[in-house]
């Protein structure tokens, strides 16, 4: 499998040249679309799926059977930087700490232009590919045979250490439809070798609001609190760093062959935003606040989920419910007005996923 992927990738790359992309800023002009600029890099990290080292939900069942060392993996994640020098990380505010492994939040309104200055700090080729937005071939960020010119393919596979600039636009069809909430979720991710890229950790959220519907800080006017949660099964056997991670985990797979289902099971992490067993940072809100939840699933075979909130209900697709359904890479939003004070469980209702630790807590204050 690895050999066939390598041959395919080398064939597609053979005709490409990868100079550093450049961008000339548009002058200030009220008649022009608003340009939202982001500086994002793909960085290597050591990621801990359970940094506290234990199950914080208190639900009955065994703690992670392999111990905390089995939840530490080398991964790649998207980080936001303050400028194009890519030397100073932009701090993540407390309200967005729950994003966990997800890349920085990209926001825009219908009619805007999004400019992403991207740098690849990893050891493998990668990219940034957005769902839902409009883009030319130069900014698709997805490597496949599409008869585009070599010049138009440069952003599909950014080499280690190199930079590239993506330009995405937000037409009406990228924003909320009639009957939608005022803001909707899209996802961006690396699309070089998509299964490997995403299982390595390269994915993040995009929120698009209807034109004129946001506050000065970019949040929707009709919402007081937002949460973004990825119901993500990470298959570490599909990571670019599987070999190096496996070297540190041999004792957990002794006597198992790679082809054994039990071997792969040891490398499946059932996470919410890359964190398991209640290790997701606190999600808090006040009674009566207007809360919007944005949910999506990762792209593995196991990523069929039924997110469920205890103690509250939400409005999803104009229906009152306390549980929604997700398929691989499906994105949804649900609105909540919490009325039940306390700390509540939020989890996937698929039994294997509950047992794997796909659970978190949220708290409603008076």
Identify the role of each PLM range.
Residues 8-19:
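Bacterial N-terminal signal peptides
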């Amino acid at each position: 499998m690895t050999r066939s992927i390598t041959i395919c990738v080398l064939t597609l790359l053979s005709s490409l040249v990868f100079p550093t992309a450049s961008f000339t800023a548009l002058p200030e002009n009220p008649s022009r679309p608003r340009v939202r600029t982001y500086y994002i890099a793909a960085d290597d990290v050591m990621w801990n799926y359970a940094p506290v080292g234990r199950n914080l939900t208190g639900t009955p069942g065994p703690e992670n059977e392999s111990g905390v060392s089995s939840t530490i993996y080398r991964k790649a994640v998207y980080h936001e930087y303050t400028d194009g020098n890519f030397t100073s990380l932009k701090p993540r505010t407390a309200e967005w700490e729950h994003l966990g492994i997800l890349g920085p939040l990209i926001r825009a309104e219908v009619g805007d232009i999004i400019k992403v200055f991207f740098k690849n700090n990893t050891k493998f080729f990668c990219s940034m590919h957005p769902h839902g937005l409009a883009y030319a071939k130069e900014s698709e960020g997805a490597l496949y045979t599409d008869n585009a010119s070599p010049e138009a393919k440069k952003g599909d596979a950014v080499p280690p250490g190199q930079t590239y600039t993506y330009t995405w636009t937000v037409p009406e069809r990228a924003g909320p439809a009639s009957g939608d909430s005022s803001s909707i979720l899209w996802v961006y991710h690396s699309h070089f070798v998509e299964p490997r890229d995403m299982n390595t950790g390269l994915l993040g959220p995009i929120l698009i609001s209807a034109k004129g519907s946001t506050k000065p800080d970019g949040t929707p006017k009709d919402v007081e609190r937002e949460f973004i949660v990825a119901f993500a099964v990470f298959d570490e056997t599909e990571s670019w760093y599987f070999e190096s991670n496996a070297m540190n985990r041999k004792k957990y797979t002794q006597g198992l062959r790679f082809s054994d289902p039990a071997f792969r099971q040891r490398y499946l992490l059932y996470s919410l935003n890359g964190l398991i067993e209640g290790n997701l940072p606190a999600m808090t809100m006040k009674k009566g606040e207007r809360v919007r939840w944005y949910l999506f699933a990762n792209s593995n075979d196991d990523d069929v989920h039924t997110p469920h909130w205890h103690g509250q209900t939400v409005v999803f697709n104009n229906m009152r419910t306390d549980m929604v359904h997700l398929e691989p890479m499906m994105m949804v939003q649900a609105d909540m007005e919490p009325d039940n004070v306390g700390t509540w469980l939020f989890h996937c209702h698929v039994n294997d996923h509950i047992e794997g630790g796909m659970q978190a807590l949220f708290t409603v204050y008076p």
